[in-house]
Design a protein with these regions (language model features):
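Beta-strand-enriched cores of mature, soluble protein domains
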Residues: 1-150
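N-terminal polybasic/positive-inside topogenic patches
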Residues: 155-157
Length: 157
């Protein structure tokens, strides 16, 4: 398998909320805003509903988002993954990304499974905590797609 870069998304979480759960887990909700650059270029907006194991534990991103492409197209995306909590200032994230688009040239992504790798960076400057007490940092996510298309085995004729 060979991968090729598809785009890079840089985003921030201007708002967030969190609920503490039994066993030290946390359920969080983040609003994401940013920019997508690469084969798809445009505005990025989304929501992340990750679950995190303790203050310094791993986390599971669960994103739904939209890219408003500069050419007017709308590309919806779904991203699931796993994040390592170390090192704290550059937490690492990997995952799978699925897209939905209703026009060319993006429609080809509808039956492609993309992989992503990225990092969550600690803010370079002091930022005020949001209403939940969390510091809102910056994330950098690169998505890659396989050169060959992948079709779901469960798709019925």
């Amino acid at each position: 398998m060979r991968l090729e870069p598809l785009y890079r998304i840089r985003f921030t979480y201007p708002e967030s909320w969190a609920v503490s759960l039994d066993g030290g887990w946390q359920q969080m909700f983040f609003i994401a805003e940013g920019r997508c650059e690469g084969a798809i270029t445009g505005r990025f907006r989304g929501a992340n509903f990750p679950r995190k194991e303790g203050a310094a534990g791993p986390f599971r991103p669960d994103f739904r988002a939209v890219i408003e492409a500069d050419d007017g197209a709308t590309i919806m995306m779904e991203w699931h993954g796993y994040g390592r909590a170390c090192p704290p200032e550059r937490r690492q994230v990997v995952g799978s990304v699925f897209h939905l688009a209703d026009r060319e040239p993006y429609r080809r992504l509808n039956d492609v499974v993309c992989v992503c790798a990225g990092e969550v960076r600690a803010p370079a400057i002091q930022v005020r905590p949001d209403r939940s007490g969390h510091r809102c940092g910056r994330a950098d996510l690169g998505a890659h797609r396989r050169l060959t298309r992948w079709r779901a085995a469960s798709r019925l004729p």
